[in-house]
Every structure is written in C-alpha cells, then in structure tokens.
C-alpha cells in the first residue's frame, strides 16, 4: 500500500498521473487529501486518516509518498506512524515558503516546535529524498544539505518542482519500499 500526499496544488491533474505511475510499484495507492490551508487541522486530519487506512492494511511495508508540501507531511506522518517515506522535492520550511499563500503559515513553526525533538535523527534511513536539480520553487541544494545526514538523496536532472514523471525513479522507490 502506498499513501500519496499531494502538494499545495491539491487539484492538479498531475496528482492522478503520479498515483497511476506509483501503481507500477503497488496496485493499492491511496490519496490522502488535506486542505493545505490550515496546518494544525491538516496534521490532525492526516494522522487520523492514515490511522484509519492502516486498520484495513495487510501490507507489511506501507509507504508514504509526498511531493512538495505533501513531502513535508509524508516525512512527519510517516515518522509518527513508523512508516517509510519518499520525499519528492520536499518543502522543508513551509512557515517561510507559504507566506502570502495561506492565512497562518506560522502554524508550521508551531508544529515543528511540538514535534519530537531531533525526529530526523530518530528517522534516519526511513525516508529517501528525490530532488530536482531544476526545481523552480525550492532550493534543492539547501534541501539536500539539510537531509543528507539522515536520508538517501536521489537527484533528477530534468523534472520541475511538481515532478510530473516518476518513471525513472520507480525501481528505486520500489526497492526502498521492499528493503
């Protein structure tokens, strides 16, 4: 089972396409949707929704996959549920990058302060990160520097921030899920 978390653009047709591509790894791909506008509510909703879906899961190794803002949540929700995560162009600092896009981006900083201290250290090797060298939204070099002490970093030379084509990375994602 794969839980897919969309980015800030929840209605993008690319979400359906990415879910279809992920079905080459596991036919059971589930969209876990969230508002993107209310961080504290989103966190509660995502925790509850993943817990509910896990009740009906017979997969010994379910996987969280998120893109952009969805990768921010995949890392945290995956950690809190003991799941591996694939972070695609993760938005590591939405309290900064979401300024002017949502009402209270400072809620992300509050969430970070309330999270388990040094959660990445405790989550080492339980996530892999796929970064685009041509991400037009986020600084992928800074993201790599922040995450490389904890997670494997895979680079893509052609995809943009929304990462429409996962095909080149599906074998690595599958190996990570099963490994």
From Swiss-Prot:
Top-level taxonomic group: Bacteria
Q: Which Gene3D superfamilies match?
A: alpha/beta hydrolase
Q: Which family does it belong to?
A: Belongs to the UPF0227 family.
Task: Kindly give the NCBIfam families that the UniProt entry links to this protein.
Answer: PRK04940.1 (NF003431)
Q: What is this protein called?
A: UPF0227 protein Shewmr4_1727
Q: What is the lineage of its organism?
A: Bacteria, Pseudomonadati, Pseudomonadota, Gammaproteobacteria, Alteromonadales
């Amino acid at each position: 089972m794969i839980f897919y978390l969309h980015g800030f653009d929840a209605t993008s047709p690319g979400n359906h396409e990415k879910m279809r591509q992920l079905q080459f790894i596991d036919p059971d791909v589930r969209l876990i949707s969230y508002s993107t506008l209310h961080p504290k509510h989103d966190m509660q909703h995502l925790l509850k929704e993943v817990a509910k879906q896990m009740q009906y899961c017979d997969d010994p190794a379910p996987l969280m996959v998120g893109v952009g803002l969805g990768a921010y949540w995949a890392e945290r929700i995956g950690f809190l549920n003991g799941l591996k995560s694939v972070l695609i162009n993760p938005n590591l600092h939405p309290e900064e990058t979401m300024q002017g896009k949502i009402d209270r981006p400072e809620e992300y900083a509050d969430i970070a302060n309330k999270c388990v201290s040094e959660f990445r250290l405790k989550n080492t090797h339980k996530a892999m990160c796929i970064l685009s060298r041509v991400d037009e939204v986020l600084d992928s070099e800074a993201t790599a520097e922040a995450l490389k002490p904890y997670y494997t970093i895979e680079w893509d030379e052609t995809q943009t921030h929304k990462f429409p084509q996962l095909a080149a990375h599906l074998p690595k994602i599958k190996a990570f899920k099963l490994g």
